[in-house]
Design a protein with these regions (language model features):
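Structured mid-domain segments that build the active-site/substrate or prosthetic-cofactor binding neighborhood
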Residues: 172, 177, 189-268
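C-terminal regions of mature proteins
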Residues: 114-117, 273-417, 423-424
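An aromatic/glycine/proline-enriched structural segment found at the starts
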Residues: 75, 112-168, 277, 281-286, ...
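Scaffold signal of the M16-like zinc-metallopeptidase fold and its non-catalytic homologs
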Residues: 4, 21, 25-28, 32, ...
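Extracytoplasmic
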Residues: 4-6, 108-110, 167-169, 234-236, ...
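Acidic/histidine-enriched alpha-helical segments
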Residues: 6, 37-55, 120, 139-153, ...
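Active-site-adjacent, His/Asp/Glu-enriched structural segments that form or flank metal-binding
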Residues: 1-62, 92, 96-110, 120-123, ...
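Conserved small/polar residues in nucleotide/adenosyl-binding loops
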Residues: 436-441
Length: 441
């Protein structure tokens, strides 16, 4: 796949006990990296493939995003950076242009190879060195530039409509400086990422609670943190919502109110206790399942390390570290981080909605005014309604198993209880924890 600033080639499900297949895959990787022929006829065939890919991706939201980029990234390379780009270019670029591009950017100092599987590491390393020995580093290579994203004092707002979009949505971004790659392999980075994760988790819990109301102000809402849209040289805290056709104004005001409530008053001890416990439980689960981790999990971790310098100390280290770190980070520290993430400047807004007669959307001026009003919203601190009452006042009388049938489905044992509930039990060694689900028709 190709995205804004990376291309990843992947070969999966290779039978490692078949030497000839493994060797063929290494040759394929070699040719992708430096030896693609780029014959005129093959280039023309690929133009057709890319045209079809463009057509399949040319959705209403894709068109809105393409039009939004110049507003979100004014005077920037990111303003026009969709991977496929212009069909006019795809149809008409000279053959030599793609050959020059390939020679310029497909080179060993910008490439990494990740191989994960049931292999002999020393043998695989020797094969790699032999297969890739003829791939030479270029003389005076072009500089790999990471383009910065400018700050903005006034909100950058884009409003787009399209006939293919069915429901309105709005996204607010609060930009911040990206964490330096050179400092990511530190305890400090883990602590900051943990605190951001906790803040996002608790805000999402509040939004989910609102969604459960009888007549919620939005059909969906969420908060998040990561790269600013398509640029990894800037980070952003974001909050977004979707709504009914006539409800985007209420939706956007509600999510901004909850964002401001989190900034102004922070989160409660009880909210944090739950979020931290769930986080540590997930870490423990990953630790317990470490011997059964899938290859893709390792590969994705290695890709993040190679491209973004994300640390990869291993789950054993992370499990021990986070069980020491998390209990010693108070909720006050989380609240302070939220105040830093939700800024009065560096705000970007993307509103997308159906192009329909009679449907009205807030103007850029109205959205900007609402953002400026955030600090004056009439809000009260969030009240975490935690009950100390037992789940059941009285322990119910137990039923009984009325029938038991072995080998019913996939080697399970089927139990039928006296209240009609059907229970399927299967003992496996796939997971180190108990898995339970309770669906109903």
């Amino acid at each position: 796949y190709t995205s804004i600033d990376k291309t990843v080639y992947r070969i999966s499900n290779v039978p490692t006990d078949n030497v000839s297949v493994v060797d063929s895959c290494l040759l394929i990787l070699h040719d992708w990296s430096s030896a693609i022929n780029l014959a005129d006829k093959e280039i023309d065939k690929e133009r057709g493939v890319i045209r079809e890919e463009w057509r399949s991706r040319n959705s209403g939201m894709q068109r809105i995003m393409t039009n939004a980029l110049p507003v979100m990234y004014p005077d920037s390379k990111y303003a026009d950076c969709m991977p496929i780009g212009s069909l006019d270019v795809i149809n008409n670029f000279p053959y030599q242009d793609i050959r020059d591009y390939y020679a310029k950017w497909y080179r060993p100092d910008l490439q990494g190879i990740m191989i994960v599987g049931d292999i002999n590491v020393d043998e695989m390393e020797a094969k790699l060195k032999k297969v890739f020995a003829d791939v030479k580093a270029p003389v005076n290579p072009a500089e790999r530039i990471y383009y910065p994203v400018a700050d903005n004092q006034e909100p950058q707002i884009f409003i787009g409509t399209d006939k293919e979009i069915e429901t309105p949505s709005i996204s607010f971004f609060f930009k911040s400086e990206a964490f330096p790659d050179s400092l990511k392999n530190t305890i400090n980075y883990y602590g900051i990422q943990y605190m951001i994760s906790m803040g996002v988790t608790m805000l999402n819990s509040r939004l989910a609670e609102i969604r459960q109301q009888a007549n919620p102000p939005f059909t969906g809402a969420s908060a998040g943190y990561g790269d600013f849209f398509v640029a990894k040289t800037k980070s952003a805290f974001g909050v977004d919502a979707s709504s009914k056709i006539d409800g985007i104004e209420l939706a956007m005001k509600t999510i901004l109110e909850e964002t401001e409530r989190a900034r102004r008053f922070g989160f409660t001890e009880t909210e944090y206790d739950r979020a931290r416990a769930n986080y540590l439980q997930r870490v423990e689960s990953a630790y317990n399942e470490r011997e059964k981790m899938k290859n893709d999990t390792y590969v994705n971790e290695y890709i993040s390390n190679f491209l973004d310098n994300e640390p990869m100390p291993g789950i054993e280290y992370e499990y021990a570290m986070m069980n020491q770190l998390a209990p010693n980070i108070p909720v006050a520290a989380i609240n302070q981080v939220m105040q830093q993430l939700i800024t009065d400047n560096n705000q970007v807004v993307l509103l997308a909605g159906p192009e329909k007669e009679g449907v009205k959307y807030p103007t850029k001026e109205e959205i900007a005014a609402l953002l400026k009003q955030m600090k004056s919203f009439d809000l009260k601190p969030y009240e975490d309604k935690v009950s100390n009452e037992p789940l059941l006042k009285e322990e119910p009388k137990g039923g009984k198993i009325v029938s038991e049938k072995a080998g019913d489905i996939y080697g399970t044992t089927k139990l039928v209880l006296s209240n009609g509930v059907k229970v399927y039990i299967k003992t496996t060694d796939y997971k180190a924890c108990l898995l339970y689900t309770s669906p109903s028709p």
